[in-house]
Every structure is written in structure tokens, then in C-alpha cells.
């Protein structure tokens, strides 16, 4: 019997009706009310997520920048204190170790936020490539993370923060600010396609903060949300999920996050040659949106065909709560990636007609 890991908020899930599942070795809530309700709450109001299963790694020291420049694809030298950056770590062949966020807290002080299922692998990979006096410390068990997302998120969070949240622009953060008296790092980031904030605090403070936010947000209809809605929201916004759109066999260029790859930065980094070649000349595969014309929902690993030729496979798919359509993301041969290309998806041994459509499926109005 495998013992599942739990976040510091596990004991409060039941109070709000949380139904838990095994997610990559973690016992996490898939939903509280319903995935559809929670999804709609984030698109129209606000939702609160426990994302404390995510990993956090500190990188400090005089050589911290030089080290990060070597192990990530984006250009960390452009990051200023108080800024966040989305990036990837790659193997030498261009395959993806993980995608992550980097927060620059000080000139020699960075916080890396990595995917829960990759914590041990990522930490070992980082530690094995350390240079100079850079120090890498896994602080995942000490840090909790809450995400408040949606058009009403700022107004709700503002009730328990004295600092003006409007000053925190997209992909910026403030460290050591008080949220209902609790010291936290607050960043204007998220994984839903909506405006919102991610709040990092000590593990022991997480439950109090969760309860307080739901209390002050009750009037605006703030809902606790689970992994189900987190997945449908990120999927509509076409934000990649490691293990589906990204993997050791899929490069960031193929996955459509080439903006986070800077092959011309001065530093050499793992995967540079492959990624430079793909960025300049195009990759042989491309992540595209697909809409099913007939009945059926595309799911991960379902094959995609043109005639008898298998041209790729679905990475994620669902019945979109916002668009009310059956849509998917698929990694396919670039020759067939043009919008309006007609393809077929094999769903339960039956070929179903689909068409390549533009992404992102959903983009919020500013």
C-alpha cells in the first residue's frame, strides 16, 4: 500500500466537501462542488486553489545566476528583483526536464517553482549540475501555495492586504508582505488564463489563510476549487501540463512555448543546439488545437490520423465548459498543422472527424 503525500490543507478539505484522488502520489481534491461550477466561478468570479503540492527550490550564492543560465532555457539575466519568469529545463537532446517559474527575490536569491510529480527528479538534476558557490536547497515541505484566480480575485485579496495590489503587475511579485498578518510572497501569476495571484507562505500558516480568504470572499462568491477545474481552465488557456504537452520526449519548441527559449543568450545551456535549430528552422512536430466535429471526446494518447497515416496523438482533451465544445491539444506532424486541416481521432476503436483550430481556445478580455 503506497502512502499518499498530503498538503498542509488536507484536514480542511472535508469541511468544504472536497473529494480527493491520487494525483502523482498526492492525495488532493479533484473537486469540492462540481468541476463545471468551479470552472465557471473562476471564469466569472473567483476560485481558490490549494497548490501546495508544487515544489519549491531555493538557489542562492554569487554563482546563482551563472548556474541558472546553464540549466534553464530562458534568459535569467533579464530578470529584475521582484520579477517572475516562465522557463523550462531541458536535457541535452532538447527533451524537457520540467517547466517552471523563477522568482528573483534578491541579487543572489532565486525561488524556483516546479511540478509536484517532478520534485525529486528536478532537485537531483539541479544538484548534479551545480557550479561554483551556487547553493540549491529543496524547501518544498516548508512552503505552502494558494492560488486565488478570476476577475474578482484582486478585490477579494485586497481585503486582507494593506499593500495596493494594483502595483503588482503581471509576472511581478512582492515578498514578505502581510496577508491577514501572515508573511507571504504574493505574485500576479496563475495557471487558469484569468487574472489572479499565487500566495506562498509557511506550511503552518496555510490553513488559516485558506479559511480567511474563503470567509472574506464569500460575498463575491469565492469558491474552493480542485484539480479538475484547474486542469480544464489551464487546458482552455492552452497552458502546457508536464507529462502531457511536455515530457522528456517533447521539446519546449514542439509544445509551443518557444517564447521561453532564448538560444541566443550568451550562456550555453542544456539542449541549446537542438532548440536553436528547431526555433530557427521549425520542429518536425507541432502542438495544435483540434475540435471534434462528430460525437466523442479526445483523450490523452488517442491517435490522430489523416487517411491511414498516423500523424500524432492527443496530449489533452475535454468537453470545454466555457466553449461547450469537444476540443483537444494534439502533437502532430507539422505538415498537417495548418488551421482548418481535417483529421480523424481514434476514440474507442472508432475514427471520429475533427479539424485543426487556432489556440488558445480561450483568452480573457482585458
UniProtKB/Swiss-Prot annotation:
Chain's gene name: gcvT
GO CC entries: cytosol; glycine cleavage complex
Biological processes, Gene Ontology terms: glycine decarboxylation via glycine cleavage system
Name of protein: Aminomethyltransferase
Gene3D superfamilies: Aminomethyltransferase beta-barrel domains (3.30.70.1400), Aminomethyltransferase fragment (4.10.1250.10), Probable tRNA modification gtpase trme, domain 1 (3.30.1360.120)
Annotated function: The glycine cleavage system catalyzes the degradation of glycine.
The keyword Transcription appears for this protein: no
Homology family: Belongs to the GcvT family.
GO terms of molecular function: aminomethyltransferase activity; transaminase activity
Catalytic activity annotation: N(6)-[(R)-S(8)-aminomethyldihydrolipoyl]-L-lysyl-[protein] + (6S)-5,6,7,8-tetrahydrofolate = N(6)-[(R)-dihydrolipoyl]-L-lysyl-[protein] + (6R)-5,10-methylene-5,6,7,8-tetrahydrofolate + NH4(+)
Complexes and interactors: The glycine cleavage system is composed of four proteins: P, T, L and H.
Upper classification of the organism: Bacteria, Bacillati, Bacillota, Bacilli, Bacillales
Key words of the record: Aminotransferase, Transferase
Enzyme nomenclature, EC number: 2.1.2.10
